[in-house]
């Protein structure tokens, strides 16, 4: 018996359960109509909210920075991998988020795994929404702080946890997603911040799916609720609405400088290629100059969500461009996804462990770049397949 036979057994279990998902090959840029495995399909699974991933201005910025600085940085940030373009991007992000300073990480995931252990450790407590992203869960575990979970977006339960933990720890950190990636609902940040201030807790908001979507010019959920200056730490991504790659932390200068010294993913990873940093910088500039992109995103979101609901689909509590079509049964959710693809619509099926058992779904995301024709064609496919499978 080979030492790796258990891997084959686990894979076979996924296949027998109908949950094995091969990697699909994207053979075009991220566009509303993309080429996947040789076919043009309507793309409803991209995080490219504002349609910037294929914007010619980002590509030109990347080309010019590559010619000026080279293809790669060749070092970690703390040795000789901090280039002028990295500093320019971080200064722009700090201004954009209305904070003292910002620092860029290699991904949004590594932001959370790197920052949380710097804020809290043994003798401290993390108070986390039960539906927070996997990267937050990992960051909390790595911190070795005591983890307390409160029921999703339940402020009475959060108040209970805070009252029970008053005076029990050196420091406490309340962590929440700004927008929850599987359900598309928005965290009740005003109530969270008020409770945090009442109980003397730091606050931490992961704005991965809020950046470019909520707030003035896409500044995120904190700005959306008028809470600038009242949230300790904001984490954002450069790979979704910004359309490129990476994540960032925005907050007090003391935190940012401490992350230079103690943020392990930052310390031990080569910095972004200069072309990536330049494209991110250009995207932020476009977001400031073209607010109509966000207006189109929300027009498309409202239209698509309303039509799905009219057809009889369960879209849960979504308030954002993330619109789940909740099926429940895992196999049937995957069947819905597969049949939609046959009808020319790519919408990824999501099942356990990404979502709880009994909550399997097809997750859709519309973008600013979709046309009404794109959305109507996708809705027709949902109607046809939904009736075939007895979902509506």
UniProtKB/Swiss-Prot annotation:
Keywords: Acyltransferase, Biotin biosynthesis, Pyridoxal phosphate, Transferase
Pathway: Cofactor biosynthesis; biotin biosynthesis
GO biological process: biotin biosynthetic process
UniProt xrefs under InterPro entries: Aminotrans_II_pyridoxalP_BS, Aminotransferase_I/II_large, AON_synthase_class-II, AONS_Archaea/Firmicutes, AONS_Archaea/Proteobacteria, PyrdxlP-dep_Trfase, PyrdxlP-dep_Trfase_major, PyrdxlP-dep_Trfase_small
Sites bearing N6-(pyridoxal phosphate)lysine, chain numbering: 240
Binding-site positions, substrate: 21, 133, 354
EC main group: transferase
EC number: 2.3.1.47
Catalytic activity line of the entry: 6-carboxyhexanoyl-[ACP] + L-alanine + H(+) = (8S)-8-amino-7-oxononanoate + holo-[ACP] + CO2
GO MF annotation list: 8-amino-7-oxononanoate synthase activity; glycine C-acetyltransferase activity; pyridoxal phosphate binding
Cofactor(s), by name: pyridoxal 5'-phosphate
Ranges in a coiled coil: none
Residues bound to pyridoxal 5'-phosphate: 108-109, 181, 206-209, 237-240
Complex formation: Homodimer.
PANTHER family registered for this protein in UniProt: CLASS II AMINOTRANSFERASE/8-AMINO-7-OXONONANOATE SYNTHASE (PTHR13693), LD36009P (PTHR13693:SF3)
Similarity field: Belongs to the class-II pyridoxal-phosphate-dependent aminotransferase family. BioF subfamily.
Main function: Catalyzes the decarboxylative condensation of pimeloyl-[acyl-carrier protein] and L-alanine to produce 8-amino-7-oxononanoate (AON), [acyl-carrier protein], and carbon dioxide.
Protein name: 8-amino-7-oxononanoate synthase
UniProt source species: Symbiobacterium thermophilum (strain DSM 24528 / JCM 14929 / IAM 14863 / T)
Taxonomic path: Bacteria, Bacillati, Bacillota, Clostridia, Eubacteriales
